[in-house]
């Protein structure tokens, strides 16, 4: 089957644009086009994003209410009395992730009622925050009862068991990501102020000569980078790097602390922890031009893609560690392939693309997006997989919710942001990464460009791209030729197509074949 990529005659593909003179904060050399600038018009993703807004986010908040997650904030903040109501000390994080998803969703589907609910919820979170900025409802509630009810995973003193399982810093990482998303969506600083107060405490408590416990479950690194971008305060960036650099060399492989991060060559341990850490390292590599980090994550990416990834793009072969096994040990029936790990691997591959501009990273991203991630949520958007095995006897069914609800809340925050993976820019270079029908507005080298796609992907391989610049000029359009259109199932030779199609794609510009 031929995959036709046709460019309409609205424009000549090269357009001369002035170099952007605006000074930008050092960051990724390639920048994603924000999801708010890309309106999907397809019949595949657009309905799913709407379903996420209309079904997933409301039911996720409903379960947070009924399970006691929201009530924990009310008790910690003095609005109610009682003991900690939920199972895990990281249950706060689900609320933060759903706030993040709701904030993204508001920018596509404005909803005054939802925004008002967020205002009230954030007010409750603020009440639960202690005067010095500490926010961890399990401890705050336990201290109201003389320490009774403190989770066994938490130490009597703050932070000291975070390397193990307390998840104090994990919760905060998701708080910071939610706070930046909410501020960008609404312009309100209510949650951002809570996040800054918290991060200032973490910065005060952690560092050389202070607490040197590394995060047991990575994510705060990405959250701190987002906070740095939002505020310009470099201490948050420095703290993110500190948390990465204090890992290893004598820690557990389970949470990637068996070596210093710059010495690691293999993907090991818990796959969600791992991909969140690699994504945080990519952020630091981009902002600080850190070659040691870049070399490490490049080696690790190769280890994953050449021997530890499923044909669906899923990662994590074993349930015991919810993570990676030895190379080529990829059982189908017992495959773990956690939904959160698929989302984490999408984060990781997208960041590597933004560093290098190599389509192979989008090949992995696309494979995971349409398969191992997407299987994690039902078409009705109200039932979820935690693991996604490749073989089933029929007993493995999606669930409405989980006691450990990291996957539904992750889906709720990831799906609204999918349009942000379609395009990227670097000055006058525009990258078309995913083929999804859309209408987009792109700032290309300081000039506005309208770009649209008409496609029925993944059902059909024919794509028509139209470009309409605000004024005549020159730019470079990079069209990704997917690996599967070049007879490559995934980068490397782990998987091969049984049928090789030599004539697999055609590029036509203004009616002229330019292959």
Where are the regions that the model predicts?
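Bacterial N-terminal signal peptides that target proteins for export
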Residues: 1-9
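C-terminal motif of bacterial Sec signal peptides marking the signal peptidase cleavage site
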Residues: 16-19
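Glycan-recognition and catalytic cores of secretory/periplasmic carbohydrate-active enzymes
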Residues: 23-515
